[in-house]
């Protein structure tokens, strides 16, 4: 089925490499979190939500691995240790939920003080408007926390895009290359999986979504990873959202 013939009730979008450039995430957001994590922890170390995040970080299996790398590991958990561990996780690009939550809080400050603006490709706002005008719902599924997702779209270069979005999902619903995650999303959306179109740049995510019964299309944005021939043959590929501007709801046979 070509993009021009597709119908759906929900468009589920990934962020990095799909609505937003990979370079923004890796060259702007990640460095900002690394540069500001220690100061943020010093400012809010005694806050209950930060204490919970610190406790959760200590339960991450990689925490023991990180401490083993230190020449003189501290005998107690302190700000420097946690900040260093967060920087380590960012450098390893590990999708750890408490780290993602902490990143979201750090970014919130950056967006609030105007130091950050969320990048979205220029075709994204027009597509959101077209889909909403056609009666479709738009949801987001990203490894970044829901809070971070809302910041990108709420403080984007194109203005506040949150009014277009009806639901947000992060790794609390499951990891993005697992079939169960997409089954969980369909249940939470109260929607038949085959009526959900997932847009991503990662073949493994597209495959997991299809295994759960969703439709999936892969974005080939500038800077996205190259695809193998078998991956190109397995999925529909589009360069941007423009081929999907005419996406429509399925025909209700009772009204036809």
UniProtKB/Swiss-Prot annotation:
It catalyses: 5-methylsulfanyl-2,3-dioxopentyl phosphate + H2O = 1,2-dihydroxy-5-(methylsulfanyl)pent-1-en-3-one + phosphate. Binds 1 Mg(2+) ion per subunit. Keywords: Amino-acid biosynthesis, Cytoplasm, Hydrolase, Magnesium, Metal-binding, Methionine biosynthesis, Nucleus. Mg(2+) binds at residues 14, 16, 201. Pfam families: Hydrolase. GO terms for cellular component: cytoplasm; nucleus. It is found in: Cytoplasm; Nucleus. Pathway: Amino-acid biosynthesis; L-methionine biosynthesis via salvage pathway; L-methionine from S-methyl-5-thio-alpha-D-ribose 1-phosphate: step 3/6; Amino-acid biosynthesis; L-methionine biosynthesis via salvage pathway; L-methionine from S-methyl-5-thio-alpha-D-ribose 1-phosphate: step 4/6. It is an enzyme of class 3 (hydrolase). Its EC number is 3.1.3.77. One of its GO terms (molecular function) is magnesium ion binding. GO terms for biological process: L-methionine salvage from methylthioadenosine. Substrate binds at residues 142-143, 176. Its cofactor is Mg(2+). Monomer. NCBIfam families: enolase-ppase (TIGR01691). Belongs to the HAD-like hydrolase superfamily. MasA/MtnC family. Bifunctional enzyme that catalyzes the enolization of 2,3-diketo-5-methylthiopentyl-1-phosphate (DK-MTP-1-P) into the intermediate 2-hydroxy-3-keto-5-methylthiopentenyl-1-phosphate (HK-MTPenyl-1-P), which is then dephosphorylated to form the acireductone 1,2-dihydroxy-3-keto-5-methylthiopentene (DHK-MTPene). This is Enolase-phosphatase E1. It comes from Drosophila sechellia (Fruit fly).
């Amino acid at each position: 089925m070509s993009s021009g013939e597709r119908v759906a009730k929900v468009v589920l979008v990934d962020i990095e490499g799909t609505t937003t450039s990979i370079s923004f995430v890796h060259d702007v957001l990640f460095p900002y979190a690394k540069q500001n994590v220690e100061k943020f922890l010093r400012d809010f170390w005694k806050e209950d939500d930060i204490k919970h995040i610190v406790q959760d970080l200590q339960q991450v299996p990689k925490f023991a691995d990180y401490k083993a790398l230190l020449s003189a590991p501290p005998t107690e958990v302190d700000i420097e240790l946690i900040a260093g561990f967060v920087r380590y996780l960012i450098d390893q690009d590990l999708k750890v939920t408490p780290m993602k939550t902490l990143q979201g809080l750090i970014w919130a400050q950056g967006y609030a003080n105007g130091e950050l603006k969320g990048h979205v490709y220029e075709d994204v706002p027009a597509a959101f408007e077209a889909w909403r005008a056609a009666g479709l719902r738009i949801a987001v599924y990203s490894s970044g926390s829901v809070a971070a997702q809302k910041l990108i779209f709420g403080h984007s270069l194109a203005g506040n895009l949150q009014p277009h979005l009806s639901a947000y999902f992060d790794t609390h619903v499951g990891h993005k290359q697992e079939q169960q995650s997409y089954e969980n999303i369909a249940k939470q959306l109260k929607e038949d999986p085959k009526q959900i179109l997932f847009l991503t740049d990662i073949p493994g995510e597209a495959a997991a979504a299809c295994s759960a019964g969703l439709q999936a299309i892969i974005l080939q944005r500038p800077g996205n990873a190259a695809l193998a021939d078998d991956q190109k043959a397995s999925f529909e590929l589009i360069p941007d959202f423009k081929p999907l501007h005419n996406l429509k709801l399925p025909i209700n046979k009772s009204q036809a």
